[in-house]
Every structure is written in structure tokens, then in C-alpha cells.
Amino acid sequence: MEEQKSGRKTRVGRVLSNKMDKTVVVVVERLIHHPQYHKFIRRQNKFKAHDAQNACRVGDRVIIEESRPISKDKRWVVVQVLDKAVI
């Protein structure tokens, strides 16, 4: 991968939907520790990301990077596809 541009956040997630043109919905999961019950809870966030080549399919693992606002909801860009989904 190329050198990181300073100040831009990156996330690794899974493609949840690719029904829009040049846009994918990426779900990013993280584990948090509950302070009282000492259990790990799975939390997730959904991000709309720009996919210029329409290369991503549902189930792919991708790296997304923060960018300028592209539309009302899109502020992320797909940088790299890590794993292709097995069909």
C-alpha cells in the first residue's frame, strides 16, 4: 500500500450493499469492553464509500479512507479490496 496521507482516517470493513452506482455501504465492526459486566460487545458503524470502478461486491473486505464530501452521505473512498467474497 502507498504511504499514508497525514490526517486521513482509514478503516477496514465488509461490503454490505453495492446496489447504488459507484457507491458501496461498508460495515465496520469493533469490540468494546463493558465496564460493569466485563463482556465484550460487538458494535458496528455503516459508512457509504465511493467505489469509482464498481469493483466491490457484497462480502468483500475493503480498506476505506476518509475524504472530502462527495455527496450528502459519502465521505469515504474505497482504497483497496483485501479479500474477495466467496460465492
Curated annotation (Swiss-Prot):
Single GO biological process annotation from the record: translation
Pfam families associated with the record: Ribosomal_S17
Keyword RNA-binding recorded: yes
One of the record's GO cellular component terms: cytosolic small ribosomal subunit
One Gene Ontology molecular-function label: structural constituent of ribosome
Keywords from the UniProt entry: Ribonucleoprotein, Ribosomal protein, RNA-binding, rRNA-binding
Bilayer-spanning residue ranges: none
Gene3D superfamilies reported in the protein's UniProt record: Nucleic acid-binding proteins
Protein purpose: One of the primary rRNA binding proteins, it binds specifically to the 5'-end of 16S ribosomal RNA.
Subunit structure: Part of the 30S ribosomal subunit.
Classification via HAMAP family: Ribosomal_uS17_B
Family from the record: Belongs to the universal ribosomal protein uS17 family.
Annotated NCBIfam families: PRK05610.1, uS17_bact
PANTHER family: 40S RIBOSOMAL PROTEIN S11 FAMILY MEMBER, SMALL RIBOSOMAL SUBUNIT PROTEIN US17M
This protein's name: Small ribosomal subunit protein uS17
